[in-house]
Amino acid sequence: MFAELAEVAAAQLGPYPSLPGPELRRAARAAMGVLDLAAGDVRVERSWTDGDLAGEELSWSVGFGPRTHAYLLRPRDAAGPLPGVVALHCHGGMKWVGKEKIADGPSVPSPGPSLEVQRVRERLYGGRAYANELARRGFVVLAPDVLTWGSRRFPLGVDEPGPYDAAARDHEHVVAKYCAALGTSFAGVAAGEDLAAAAYLRSRPDVGTVGCVGLSGGGLRAALLGAFDPDMRAVVVAAMVSSYRDMIDGYVEKHTWMLWPPGLPRLGDWPDLVAARAPEPLMVQYALRDELFPEPGMRRAHTMIEERYREAPDAYEAVWADVPHSFDVTRQEQAFDWLAQRLKA
């Protein structure tokens, strides 16, 4: 039935046009209802040192819901402004925590990350907290929670990680409905929160140019930051790019509502928005054994992005790897080196 519906919609609505980048960015921001938010009343909740790193747990208000908590990590003895990176946690089917999936805070090494977090890291991140590793390379790294994760999660009446995550899977449908009823979208609210985090990082006197990086749902968030923040100097999207049209048959239900903001297909395909920042630097990592995206969709996306970067081919870096859905240590190191080239120049 969906295949037949797709044919009717294609004939009548003509989805996936190819708008110019600046026009697409403006139209997509309006269609998604991206909120204009700011990180207000920023507080340092805790600070610590961990060997060669210094860390802070920050909190701020975006104007609704519980305060956003974030980890800020930087080299302990660094002098002068350093390039900044917003490190964006994934969806991962785990909403009990957000930033902890990619960043170690003050509780490490004792008692250390939870067993649930360790499993996510082993499955997706090569077993390590990549935000801390990135900070050790000479970056100021900000890892914030976002709506429905960690400090920004909803009170669902469940106090254990496993049962909470099960409840949160169904509750995401409710969140998406409320956002639509209010004229925004799940993606639009998340993008607004991430834009606020990036603006805060950029405002710090110890931070210079700013980029962002994320895997999966974090890669989606990185792509939206790249599209909607004109001062985002370099963007890494890991295992989160395929054409919509190649996902219709069997892949739609595997993904968060954030990937399907209402109205976007009337403006362009997902790779069009990912590449709408052209000619600004973009790295996309494709996992050829990704169970969440079809290889033909990744191949089509790469061709589409290459076309949008036709006049600046050196600004687009495609990384192909015969791996499952992940941002493993090898791919992390490639991203770190690329971010250093783009942000430290």
Set out the residue ranges of the language-model regions.
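Short beta-strand element of the alpha/beta-hydrolase
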Residues: 70, 80-92
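Mobile cap/lid helix-loop segments that gate and shape the active-site cleft of serine hydrolases
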Residues: 174-184, 196-197, 234-274, 292-302, ...
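A short loop-to-beta-strand scaffold at the N-terminal edge of the catalytic core in hydrolase folds
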Residues: 55-59, 64-76
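Cap/lid segment of the alpha/beta-hydrolase catalytic domain
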Residues: 90-192, 202, 247-249
